[in-house]
UniProtKB/Swiss-Prot annotation:
The lineage of its organism: Bacteria, Bacillati, Bacillota, Bacilli, Lactobacillales. A motif (Important for interaction with partner proteins) lies at residues 158-163. NCBIfam families: PRK07275.1, ssb. This is Single-stranded DNA-binding protein 2. The keyword DNA repair applies. The gene is ssb2. Residues 131-140 have a biased composition (Polar residues). Disulfide bonds: none annotated. It comes from Streptococcus pyogenes serotype M18 (strain MGAS8232). InterPro entries: NA-bd_OB-fold (IPR012340), Primosome_PriB/ssb (IPR000424), ssDNA-bd (IPR011344). Keywords: DNA damage, DNA recombination, DNA repair, DNA replication, DNA-binding. Residues 109-163 are annotated as: Disordered. Homotetramer.
Length: 163
């Protein structure tokens, strides 16, 4: 079975950082993710996805990613249920993020000058914070051109083919 989620979106508010009784950090947040299509009135709609992240990445997210931050997360979808104070069963579906990455600098997000920092932090449970280099733009060396565009057709009969 495969249960993988990759999301890129903006945080709708600062993450809520809490600690379990055994002092394990857990942060909850909502990510606004644009849909790939526009509505009938021409506007792009967004989905608001509830997420949770645990341990050191939770503390890092709460410290570094604030409301409006563009982040990428990887994780899985999880469902759970509990009984509320009125005795009703409540079902919750959320994304459990394994790690996150800041996708823009604070200066860019706040409308300031664009700094030289265009990468982010990759915060997973198996390593400490590490800088991710910005993606490099590779030139298109005629990749869209047909490699056979200037050649003549080949004279091949069906008898020449091995199948």
């Amino acid at each position: 079975m495969i249960n993988n989620v990759v999301l890129v979106g903006r945080m709708t508010k600062d993450a809520e950082l809490r600690y379990t009784p055994s002092q394990v950090a857990v942060a909850t947040f909502t990510l606004a993710v644009n849909r790939t299509f526009k509505s009938q009135n021409g506007e792009r709609e967004a989905d608001f996805i509830n997420c949770v992240i645990w341990r050191q990445p939770a503390e890092n997210l709460a410290n570094w990613a604030k409301k409006g931050a563009l982040i990428g997360i990887t994780g899985r979808i999880q469902t759970r249920n509990y009984e509320n104070q009125q005795g009703q069963r409540v079902y919750v579906t959320e994304v459990v993020a394994d790690n996150f990455q800041m996708l823009e600098s604070r200066a860019t997000r706040e409308g300031g000058s664009t700094g030289s920092f265009n990468g982010g932090f990759n915060n997973n449970t198996s390593s400490s914070n590490s800088y991710s280099a910005p993606a490099q733009q590779t030139p298109n060396f005629g990749r869209d051109d047909s490699p056979f565009g200037n050649s003549n057709p080949m004279d091949i009969s069906d008898d020449d083919l091995p199948f």
